[in-house]
Design a protein with these regions (language model features):
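Glycine/threonine-rich flexible loop motifs
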Residues: 101-108
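Short acidic low-complexity segments
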Residues: 74-90
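Glycine-rich, N-terminal phosphate-binding loop of Rossmann-like dinucleotide-binding domains
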Residues: 96-98, 123
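N-terminal Rossmann-like NAD(P) cofactor-binding module of classical short-chain dehydrogenase/reductase
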Residues: 93-94, 120
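Helix-to-beta-strand junctions that scaffold the AdoMet/dcAdoMet cofactor pocket
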Residues: 113-114
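Conserved acidic residues
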Residues: 90-91, 117
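NAD(P)+-binding Rossmann beta1-loop-alpha1 motif at the extreme N-terminus of oxidoreductases
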Residues: 2-75
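Rossmann-fold NAD(P)-binding glycine/threonine-rich loop
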Residues: 118-142
Length: 142
């Protein structure tokens, strides 16, 4: 592990020496990683995971960004779904929608966050200000 300084905060960071790509593939081999949103962060994160051998699907509403996902090789009905369907199919749910998008889709996807699934955010306005947004994950979701 390494000690790294992030803006004056020193954190211990796990490196590839302790947790290799091969180990990550083994640990996640039975998981479906659902990337919700294909705007700013989605293409990079989804493509990186896919290119490194992980089972990845994308959830995106129809429109220009959906068309971009198709152009990038995501296949409708196979690796590209509606946001709701991707949330249902995924075991690891990556919330990459805009803050406003997260708030808008939350009522539609929370039913798919079932026990044992993992939910993560790359930016967290909606979850950090849940008293204002209503985005409150179930207690049995990691």
């Amino acid at each position: 592990m390494a000690q790294m300084n992030f803006g004056g905060v020193v954190e211990t960071v796990v490196t590839s020496k302790e947790f290799s790509l091969e180990k990550a593939r083994e640990v996640l081999k039975n998981e479906t990683i659902a990337i919700l949103g294909y705007g700013i962060q989605g293409p990079g994160q989804a493509g990186n995971l896919r290119d490194n051998g992980f089972n990845v699907i994308v959830g995106q509403r129809p429109g220009k960004t959906y068309d971009k996902a198709v152009a990038d090789g995501w296949v409708p009905g196979k690796t590209l779904f509606s946001v709701e369907e991707a949330a249902e199919k995924g075991t690891i749910i990556c919330m990459l929608l805009s803050d406003a998008g997260q708030i808008a889709v939350w009522p539609k996807i929370k039913q798919y966050l079932t026990p044992g699934k993992t939910l993560y955010y790359s930016h967290g306005f909606a979850i950090n200000w849940n008293d204002r947004t209503g985005v409150v994950p179930p207690a049995d979701v990691d």
